[in-house]
Amino acid sequence: MKVLPASGLAVLVTALKFATADPNLLAATPRTFRSNYHLAQAYLDKYYTKKGGPQAGEMVARESNPMIRRIKELQIFFGLKVTGKLDQNTMNVIKKPRCGVPDVANYRLFPGEPKWKKNILTYRISKYTPSMSPTEVDKAIQMALHAWSTAVPLNFVRINSGEADIMISFETGDHGDSYPFDGPRGTLAHAFAPGEGLGGDTHFDNAEKWTMGTNGFNLFTVAAHEFGHALGLGHSTDPSALMYPTYKYQNPYRFHLPKDDVKGIQALYGPRKIFPGKPTMPHIPPHKPSIPDLCDSSSSFDAVTMLGKELLFFKDRIFWRRQVHLPTGIRPSTITSSFPQLMSNVDAAYEVAERGIAFFFKGPHYWVTRGFHMQGPPRTIYDFGFPRHVQRIDAAVYLKEPQKTLFFVGEEYYSYDERKKKMEKDYPKNTEEEFSGVSGHIDAAVELNGYIYFFSGRKTFKYDTEKEDVVSVVKSSSWIGC
């Protein structure tokens, strides 16, 4: 558990104080009023009491009854009719499950606009929930973080030990940060604004039933909201926004960050820059992805690799499978149908056939597979020894005879020794200087029968490793029957 910082908390909770009921609050029968009143006062104390609080005289000057003032604040925030009374619509809001971060102060950015001063953030899941398998939790968390990284120049790298920027855990009741959970329903989770100590940490109430679907509280939905706080956003008054404080299920596989959230997060970090070539980061696929027309396109594949006895060609949300020596029977499939964890837009891939494993790269992460079966959660590309300024791989190819993998990044490439498990010295080197006849940006690469095939735009260069020169050039689309 991190040490509680002196400031920068996203969660501001005060002690509950039960005052004498004011007749002006009454908007229910006497039988239900008392329970509504106590529930409402606890809710308002938790979510509508500003840190430090205004002076008592100021509170009285604004409203004869401070609770009426706070009820009106709640009604204004949620777009309700402003009555100052605990009417049915107001009580309906109060009874909804919600985030544990209060609604006071600025509704988009936290006071002082705290934000991270770096663009690579680490995260660690230190405690899991029994409601879901660890693999499901890992997937939901990764997808929730990815929802934000599509809009801003932030990348998230998972670590499995030590102190991360964003520590994630499932907790019960009083868990040591002074903001205890309240059991099933009520407060689902809370997060701390960027900063030292607890800054960025995100806690989920382990008393809830968490799920990847709708039979319980969807972890992706709640996690994506809480990570907005961990990045510096407050609550939004826009009911369509992810940062709206009450729970509303979002389908993880069809989710796109709403406009209000995009504006808020980009006000802190600016937009994510899109460079020529492949997208900087993958996009979550729509329900029915369209098939790229590579037969009439100047674009190349995103990645190419052998997998068993098949060649796989990746483009956007689609991949093609074909037997090496059989150019017929090639059909496209969605990436999610065979690799649900990858979702879309693979940057690079390669297979080490003698070990029976393959590697798939997206942004600063990679996945390991045996055949079409994922082997655990995503890992960081820095495991290979890349310098920190490298945030994505353009292409990768494994060379069987020297047992080395070449990684192409921009105009350069790195050489990784698969036997020693370390990056070779004196790299990176310039690609065009080292591979005679190869030109242009390398989008993908694969080795077959002693030749390296470099995919660059609409061209594929066949490079003879013995002659150390290109021996032919073909259309990239010819590989899938065009």
Curated annotation (Swiss-Prot):
Hemopexin repeats lie at residues 292-342, 343-388, 390-438, 439-482. GO terms for cellular component: extracellular matrix; extracellular region. Its cofactor is Zn(2+); Ca(2+). Autoactivates at least at the 106-Asn-|-Tyr-107 site. Zn(2+) 2 binds at residues 175, 177, 190, 203. Expressed in the enamel organ. It holds the Pfam family PG_binding_1. InterPro entries: Hemopexin-like_dom, Hemopexin-like_dom_sf, Hemopexin-like_repeat, M10A_MMP, MetalloPept_cat_dom_sf, Pept_M10_metallopeptidase, Pept_M10A, Pept_M10A_Zn_BS. Its main location: secreted. GO terms for molecular function: metalloendopeptidase activity; zinc ion binding. GO terms for biological process: amelogenesis; extracellular matrix disassembly; protein catabolic process; proteolysis. It is an enzyme of class 3 (hydrolase). Binds 2 Zn(2+) ions per subunit. Its EC number is 3.4.24.-. Disulfide bonds join 295-482. The active site is at 226. Zn(2+) 1 binds at residues 99, 225, 229, 235. It is found in: Secreted, Extracellular space, Extracellular matrix. A motif (Cysteine switch) lies at residues 97-104. CDD domains: HX, ZnMc_MMP. PROSITE patterns: CYSTEINE_SWITCH, HEMOPEXIN_2, ZINC_PROTEASE. Keywords: Autocatalytic cleavage, Calcium, Disulfide bond, Extracellular matrix, Hydrolase, Metal-binding, Metalloprotease, Protease, Repeat, Secreted, Signal, Zinc, Zymogen. Ca(2+) 1 binds at residues 163-165, 196-197, 199, 201. Belongs to the peptidase M10A family. This is Matrix metalloproteinase-20.
